Structure formats: structure tokens, C-alpha cells
Amino acid sequence: MTDGHLFNNILLGGRAGSNPGQFKVYSGGLAWKRQGGGKTIEIEKSDLTSVTWMKVPRAYQLGVRTKDGLFYKFIGFREQDVSSLTNFMQKNMGLSPDEKQLSVSGQNWGGIDINGNMLTFMVGSKQAFEVSLADVSQTQMQGKTDVLLEFHVDDTTGGNEKDSLMDLSFHVPTSNTQFLGDENRTAAQVLWETIMGVADVDSSEEAVVTFEGIAILTPRGRYSVELHLSFLRLQGQANDFKIQYSSIVRLFLLPKSNNPHTFVVVTLDPPIRKGQTLYPHIVIQFETEAVVERNLALTKEVLAEKYKDRLEESYKGLIHEVFTKVLRGLSGAKVTRPGSFRSCQDGYAVKSSLKAEDGLLYPLEKGFFFLPKPPTLILHEEIEFVEFERHGAGGASISSHYFDLLVKLKNDQEHLFRNIQRSEYHNLFNFINGKHLKIMNLGDGQGATGGVTAVLRDTDDDAVDPHLERIKNQAGDEESDEEDEDFVADKDDSGSPTDDSGGEDSDASESGGEKEKLSKKEASSSKPPVKRKPKGRDEEGSDKRKPKKKKDPNAPKRAMTPFMYFSMAERGNMKNNNPDLPTTEIAKKLGEMWQKMTGEEKQPYIQQSQVDKKRYEKESAVYRGAAAMDVDSGSGGNESD
């Protein structure tokens, strides 16, 4: 980059362990973003007070201190990075990094340096270790010469580490010259009072504000929510969670559409843990019209010194607004509200299903959020493409009044949002298209007069839907209808074996209205024999079927999805174990099995699909070259007849 430096695999050090991410330094400041999404740290140049370099095992550490007294440790720089970054900071940011040395002697006596909220134990001029006083929950005297620090034990700390620091004790002899005592106070008491002035040690005694009987959907239950100075506590009948504000990444305030409730989501990094289950999102549900009045248990001095312009003495208003304002003021987390998207009913979300759960999909300015269960946040920058999948693509047994939205991530993970009403198609497509996200399955009609655009302009369900026609043509494979129904009934494989006949996208955009009307008549009548469907279509819609008859037998077979490989492997076992199970139920069972599988269990099928995809790409390249030669010779059409 021209305006700075970019580094990958830089660790953010902290009491909860080290997380890898991407580090960027530029003329306006610096930023760190966790790998795979989550926590982000942005520091403006004007907020920086000091920068230090330290040689640590196998790497260099960059220490950054801010005006708020916070200290960040970025670990993983190479020796050659030190000089280049130092020169860049001196030239563009007006900062000259200092160099610190790490004590490796193992000596456990030395001096204490308190700078901001960081306590550093020094052995001579070298640093032995440092701890953040913001993590201290209690400090007390033990005898006359010992000071004990107890650290917060919350449900997020230690998510990445097996061990966590619980307490630390300092012995301060009466002869200590750094913390001078007198007749009434020993040197240890002077140190204790100094720490008391920095650490939020009183925060565990009394909550700043409490909200009783709050419904939390994830983790489910009714809780008393206490907001303290440095953490929040969720107290329920069966569970008790303590969460440091430093673990809060962002707050989301999302009203339900046509519903008397509003979601407030607290996103965490690291997440809280209950048994083996991790909860990266706390989903709170408030009554939208409920009004509360709360007075904060803070003195005017504390409000003026620590929370100026962030908190007020008292609040009165809607409960979700009061809760969000107070939590934002205490934690410093940003709040995300609904953006420009509006549903067909002027709501902020569309009804859909994820896996086996019904919920709401919120299209936000920088991502999608599915609530309430499982709460799933997808950022736009993580998306490789989205794909609209219309119901009815494999037969008339499923209503065409709904469609599915497949979101494929850059890490090959997929999210399939099902059963979205067709009336939401127009607004959802326009919103996604406006965010410049790649949309698959548009066929050739991406202009203003064809393809999906034509569908979006039609609100009548009987109108011609070129996008649906294209998928129906793909689904009209010449293999057995029974196999097609198996894969269409379960949408987990966003393609099904019908992809074998999907090489005629341009034909779909040219189909007339007679074909769809004919299929609707067939769907409304009693079920005809399977063999009568193509026969009836040939009689009245022969023009529509001609492209199908002209399909080149030399065309390469489409690549199969991981779910298709899984279905092929397990379908026989499913039929043997359940001989009386209908075909559509077998597909449904296979889909449920696929959803419950872990990433490791899916890996063999994913690898098979990737190999098949490469095969298809190679064969397609050869086929396109041969097809171009046939077109030039002008003999392809006569031979097919």
C-alpha cells in the first residue's frame, strides 16, 4: 500500500490469550482486525501518546498507548519491520518509538511502574511483566507489607487459553523507597491506595443500573441484567454470566417488523461459554412500547471525569433505548441500527428460515444478521457471492410464492435462508445489488429489460418469470424424475443433479409466458403420470422444448456439489433402513443429516466437489473452443437434426 504498511498474522496480546489478525499502519493512525471477522481496533494518530518496541521470543512486540490510558500489544513483527515502521511513524505520524528490553533473568524483586491503567514490574531497567489494572476486581492489604490483586474471572476470559491469571501478590518491605510511608501508612498501603485510584475495584459492590426480568433468547432464560463500571452481569435462575466490557465488539438495536418486541444484540469477542457451547451473540428481547426511568448510581464527579458527554445522571424513555444508551456509555461500544433496507411491509427485515429455525433476516448496511436463533452475523466483506433459488424449480409440488437466498462466503462456508416470500424479492434484490455484492444465477438477462430485472418489475404471481423459467429449464434433466425430486425437495445442495442440463442460460431468458402458464395448469390438476408431463409440453410448447432437444451430447457435465456427493453415498443406506419412506422424505432426512454434520465430516465430500469443479472447468474450456470452431464452419445446426 502506498500510504502505509500492512501486516498479516499479527497477534493482539491480552489476558484472554492472543488472537491473530491483520495490522495496518498509515499516516492517520493504525488499525487491527481479527482474522475471520470479529474484534476491530482503530486508533487515530491524535489519540496516540507513546509507541514502544520490545524483543519477545521469536518476534518483536509493538506497544501502543492511548490518551484514554489504554495499552495495546501487537506481536509478530520481524526484525526488518522494526526499522521500516519506525521510519514511517517518525516521518508521517510524528512519533519516535522507544525501545524496551525484556528481563529474562527470573528475578522476582524489583520496582513497580504505574502508567495509565498499566502496572509494570521492572527488574532494573528491564520489564519483567505487566498487567492491566482494568482487569483488577479487588485489591486488599494482607498484613502490613503485602498487597493482593484479584482479577476479574468472567465467562469470556480464557476462551482461547487453558489457564488464566486469578490473583497476584506484592510484598512491599517497610524499607521501600519508591512508595514512601509515614507513621500512619506503610509503604504497602501507599501502593494499595495508588492502585485503588486506578482500578475499578468498587464496581463489583454495586451496579450502576439494573434491569430486572429481562427476556434473553440466547442463552435462553430470564435474567437480571446488572451494568457495572467495567463489566455486565447476567443473573438467572440456572445461569450466571459475567462479561467484561472489553469483550463487547458491537451493539445491535433491531426492531421486529409488525411485532411488539425489539432485539438488542450484544456481540462478543471472545464469546461466553456454557459447557461446550459458545455464545458470540447475546440476543435480548425487549417490549417495544415499555417505558422505564432509571437513575445511575454514579456521583457527579465520576460522571464528569470518566463519562463526560457519554452518560447522564438519569434516563427516561423506551426500555430498549435506555438500556442501549447506558451500555454504550459504559462500554464505549458502537451501536448499529437498521439501514436503508425496507421490506414490502415497510419493515426492517424479511421472514426466513435458517436450518430448522424460523426467524428474521436483517439486511444491514455492512452485513446480514439472522435472528433470533441461531444468531448469525455475515459481513459483506466476507461474502463471495449470493444466489437466488426460486421454489418450484424442480417441479410444481413446491409453491413458487417463496424463494431461498444462498450466501456463499470466501471461506467456502454457505448459509441458506429459506422460505422468503416472493413479494420481498424486489426490495431484497435491489438492496443486494446496490451493495455491489456478486449475484449468481442471473442468466444472460442482466440488463434493464431482461433477466431478474424483468421479474422485479412484475408484482403479479401469474406474470412471466424469466429467472424461474431458467431454473426450471435447468431442472428438466433427462435423468429419472425420482432422482430430481430427491434433490429439489432438500435445498441444502444449491444445485442438485439437474445442473447436468443447465448449460442453456440464454434460452431461459427468451422463454415466453405459455410455458409457465402450462406448468401452472398441470400443477393445479390431479397428478398425471410422470411420462405425460414431457408429452403434454411437446404438444403445446414444442418451441420451448426445441433448445432442450438440441443439447449437445458432448457438452461437459456440470460439477456436483458436496451435498450431492453426500446424498449419493447415503441414499442407498437410507432406503434400506427405511423401505417405506417416500422419496421426498428421504431427501428431507438427508438434508437434516447434512445440516448436523461438522465441517470435518463434510470435508471428504467438499474435496470430491472441488476435484469435480476443476474437471468441469477444464472440460468447459475445451468444449467452448470446439463449439467456436463448429459455429465458424456453420454445420452444427444441421447435424443436430
From Swiss-Prot:
GO terms for molecular function: DNA binding; histone binding; nucleosome binding. Disulfide bonds: none annotated. Residues 476-487 have a biased composition (Acidic residues). InterPro entries: HMG_box_dom, HMG_box_dom_sf, PH-like_dom_sf, RTT106/SPT16-like_middle_dom, RTT106/SSRP1_HistChap/FACT, SSRP1-like_PH1, SSRP1/POB3, SSRP1/POB3_N. PROSITE patterns: HMG_BOX_2. GO terms for biological process: DNA repair; DNA replication. One of its GO terms (cellular component) is FACT complex. Keywords: Chromosome, DNA damage, DNA repair, DNA replication, DNA-binding, Nucleus, Transcription, Transcription regulation. Residues 556-624 bind DNA. Gene3D superfamilies: 2.30.29.150, High mobility group box domain, Pleckstrin-homology domain (PH domain)/Phosphotyrosine-binding domain (PTB), Structure-specific recognition protein (SSRP1). It comes from the Eukaryota. The keyword Transcription regulation applies. It is found in: Nucleus; Chromosome. The keyword DNA damage applies. SUPFAM superfamilies: HMG-box (SSF47095), PH domain-like (SSF50729). Component of the FACT complex, a stable heterodimer of SPT16 and SSRP1. Belongs to the SSRP1 family. PANTHER family: FACT COMPLEX SUBUNIT SSRP1. Component of the FACT complex, a general chromatin factor that acts to reorganize nucleosomes. The FACT complex is involved in multiple processes that require DNA as a template such as mRNA elongation, DNA replication and DNA repair. During transcription elongation the FACT complex acts as a histone chaperone that both destabilizes and restores nucleosomal structure. This is FACT complex subunit SSRP1-A. It comes from Oryza sativa subsp. japonica (Rice).
